[in-house]
Amino acid sequence: MQREYDYIIIGAGSAGNVLAARLTEDPGVTVLLLEAGGPDYRLDFRTQMPAALAFPLQGRRYNWAYETEPEPYMDNRRMECGRGKGLGGSSLINGMCYIRGNALDFDHWAKRPGLEDWSYRDVLPYFRKAETRDIGANDYHGGDGPVSVATPKNDNNVLFHAMVEAGVQAGYPRTDDLNGYQQEGFGPMDRTVTPRGRRASTARGYLDMAKPRDGLHIVTHATTDRILFAGKRAIGVHYLVGNSSEGIDAHARREVLVCAGAIASPQLLQRSGVGAPDLLRALDVQLVHDLPGVGQNLQDHLEVYIQYACTKPVSLYPALQWWNQPAIGAEWLFAGTGTGASNQFEAGGFIRTREEFDWPNIQYHFLPVAINYNGSNAVKEHGFQAHVGSMRTPSRGRVHAKSRDPRQHPSILFNYQSTDQDWQEFRDAIRITREIIAQPALDPYRGREISPSADCKTDAELDAFVRSRAETAYHPSCSCAMGTDDMAVVDGQGRVHGMEGLRVIDASIMPRIITGNLNATTIMIAEKIADRMRGRPPLPRSTADYYIAGDAPVRG
């Protein structure tokens, strides 16, 4: 087997697959793509059927199933931290919501020294490059990219339309495209689903077009033990296949690209000798490079479910009954349509809860059934819910390797809800959600409040609900942040500070979490850096306009 390549990519996820596909477009370039999980089995409905999105989170075949340390502000709960395992990474198990973030997220990134070319108008062309939207291209959307994006259709569930209308009746804007000119407001939510109703993971979109190339070698069930160095230069990796304890060395002529995600990327750097000296000494790992920011600055989105009974039989509750599922599965399998062909997150929104925020600080996902994201605690009646959570928490956490063993999970602490702002935002969000649900558009459907219940009113009661019931939105990020400050890990091209031949390219390099779901932005990051690595000029800056609230009131 070949043991030397131009590039070695660690992690076949949302970023790694983009890089594998783009780098091998150049003739003669060789890439080794290592993935600790298995293939993305195309006949496994658990990962391929959009409506089955909860199933991969319930086991360990496709999910690393990380768990946090006891979270001190969350009743000391050990909280779930699911990450994708298999070709596609977290794009193989995520909720398929295609949300890019707010334009001002990127403009604020670009205000940091060294990140000036990460403004919204710089990154929008790369969002477009990656995308094929089912209703065609425009100034904001692409028409010939590897990622299939489906838009909601007018004949979808009536509850989606009612919930958007209720948000507008409550005084918030309406937007026809959460990824277009104006993110702020309520409207339809795009999703990464193919025209045939299949999950559009990066394995399907990018690897499928790259697999026939002679320059790409993919190894699944390959756990990277450590990065190999010659001085300060990364020269390869040592990895294990399957359950074997005997490792394999592979060498990189050009670069090693770490794309293992916001949990595993810092853990791998630490095990390889790149990180804070005190931590490495505790692990008995020889220091290669002192870089204290590795594993710091960890961020996530937290959310709660506000659930209501539905007084008309229009929710998806019947789809949860086993006797209805064979017909749903058959329609999806043979026609690519029906309930199974949607993730059922087809409406949502972004709002500002207070005038002090320059762009939305709260996100909504609307779901026409009452159930936890991971499929647990389904309410046994017709219902609907709003997933609501804050977007740019001031809380910061960390990821620490626990040992040199590559198969041992790291220590993860998000420090959820560690600031007064966190608590105020959730109180505001729950109360505003109740106002929205109380609007006339939902009068025909609104039953009793199931969770947290109408009796939960005071600040103390709302705080107790959040402490005991809030869950991750599965958006860990920022743990190898790009920038130039003392705690930055990489520069604006993903190159690890103080090292040669080593980059980190995934959600961990975001300097600050974005306003929305992470998958689309992670793909964009990889597309943008791939052009730099290939010596290509950046795509021309967009001239598209975008909404800035300015002095506009929170509610119209």
Swiss-Prot record:
GO terms for cellular component: membrane. The keyword NAD applies. GO terms for molecular function: betaine-aldehyde dehydrogenase (NAD+) activity; choline dehydrogenase activity; flavin adenine dinucleotide binding. The active site is at residue 475. One of its GO terms (biological process) is glycine betaine biosynthetic process from choline. Pathway: Amine and polyamine biosynthesis; betaine biosynthesis via choline pathway; betaine aldehyde from choline (cytochrome c reductase route): step 1/1. Keywords: FAD, Flavoprotein, NAD, Oxidoreductase. Its EC number is 1.1.99.1, 1.2.1.8. FAD binds at residues 6-35. It catalyses: choline + A = betaine aldehyde + AH2; betaine aldehyde + NAD(+) + H2O = glycine betaine + NADH + 2 H(+). The keyword Oxidoreductase applies. InterPro entries: BetA (IPR011533), FAD/NAD-bd_sf (IPR036188), GMC_OxRdtase (IPR012132), GMC_OxRdtase_N (IPR000172), GMC_OxRtase_C (IPR007867). Its cofactor is FAD. Involved in the biosynthesis of the osmoprotectant glycine betaine. Catalyzes the oxidation of choline to betaine aldehyde and betaine aldehyde to glycine betaine at the same rate. Belongs to the GMC oxidoreductase family. PANTHER family: CHOLINE DEHYDROGENASE, MITOCHONDRIAL, GLUCOSE-METHANOL-CHOLINE GMC OXIDOREDUCTASE. This is Oxygen-dependent choline dehydrogenase. It comes from Xanthomonas euvesicatoria pv. vesicatoria (strain 85-10) (Xanthomonas campestris pv. vesicatoria).
